Amino acid sequence: MKETYVIGIDYGTDSVRALLADAATSETIADSVFSYPRWGRQEYCSPAEARFRQHPQDYLDGLRHVIGEVVAARPDAAPHIRAVSVDTTASTPCLVDRTCTPLALRPEYADDPDAMFVLWKDHTAQRESEEITALCARGEINYARRSGNHYSSECFWSKVLHLLRGSERLRRDAWAVVELCDWIPAVLTGCRAMEDLRSGLCAAGSKVMWAEEWGGYPPEEFFAGLDPVLLPILRRLPVRTYGCDTPAGTLSPEWAAKLGLSEQVVIGVGNVDCHSGAVGAGICHGTVVLNLGTSACYMAVMPPEKMGDRMVEGIFGQVDGSILPGMVGFEAGMSAFGDVYAWFKRLLCWPLREVLLPADPENETLRALAAQ
């Protein structure tokens, strides 16, 4: 049997990770981690305002770094790498221009947080979230029914509305909005137009209100009743969505040269990170998979014939095919999990850093503890 390798890439909250694996045996051949430098310095973030933004350049630098490292670890495997697939946090959208380029990659927007990717845990759009939830509840069709009758400030339309309301300049220059899990495959395949972009079912269904039962996204009348500023964005979203088992295309000549890989490498449609974690853990009907990290995402699946027309109140995402084809995927959990532990550690260590260490600065034990 010919050697066949694949690369999986996971964009998390603090870092991007890559794994080179043997497609036949699932053996891990090499891995790599790249921490986002701007994020590490908390640039463009304001915890007091619940504002958390990430610069697209961190994502691009990380992409080259992690793939470069896993390929360098086994250069003999490079000619046999057949596919690369990506999952990311969500909803992590960004305003883009006509070429699908994030506005923050243009010089005039390089330091504008609103032109960057709005990280999943950004809660600046709470007011917009409440408006959308209220509008859904009043409508003949409740377009929030698949997110537990509540549309979160962590979701796509809340964030987009907040950004566009806040800046006339952004309203002028933003041609469209792209989720991170759709943008990375677009970058790798050389996609430069929204009409050519393959939108992932997972993010569209769980974060962007896409559902087959109402023919895709909610109609223009819904968004006009919310705020007409959203209508141009709605009209430019790809109508069709694709599962992560579908190719988005092949590696572009530009990125093949950058990464030292073949232009024949298949790039998968992007996915949401916790949904990929559920698949990797072997999720099936009757099991629950817990993805524990910065947040805690609890995942389950159910055959649609057992669901019928019912929806579960309070469950964040209930989407056909979002985790496994032919199954309804469920996503619930806690937005703050690892973040709470990190806060608690900082709280406990405060006396070490602020009281004990200044009193005994040469104490190696105190210095080590305070540095953690």
What are the roles of these predicted feature ranges?
Residues M1-L105, P232, A257-V269:
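N-terminal glycine/serine-rich phosphate-binding loop of ATP-dependent small-molecule kinases
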Residues Y11-T13, A134-N271:
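Gly/Ser/Thr-rich active-site cleft segment
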Residues R17-L19, T189-A193, A211, E362-Q372:
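Conserved ATP-utilizing enzyme core subdomain
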Residues I29, P75-C155:
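Active-site phosphate-binding/coordination module
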Residues S46-A50, D111-V118, Q318-E331:
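Short beta-alpha connecting loops at secondary-structure transitions
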Residues Q54-Q57, I81-T88, Y109-A110, V118-K121, ...:
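Active-site nucleophile and cofactor-binding loops and adjacent substrate-binding regions
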Residues C155, M209-P325, L352-R353, A359-E364, ...:
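ATP-dependent carbohydrate kinase catalytic cores
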Residues G326, A332-W343, L348-C349:
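A conserved active-site cap/scaffold subdomain adjacent to cofactor or substrate pockets
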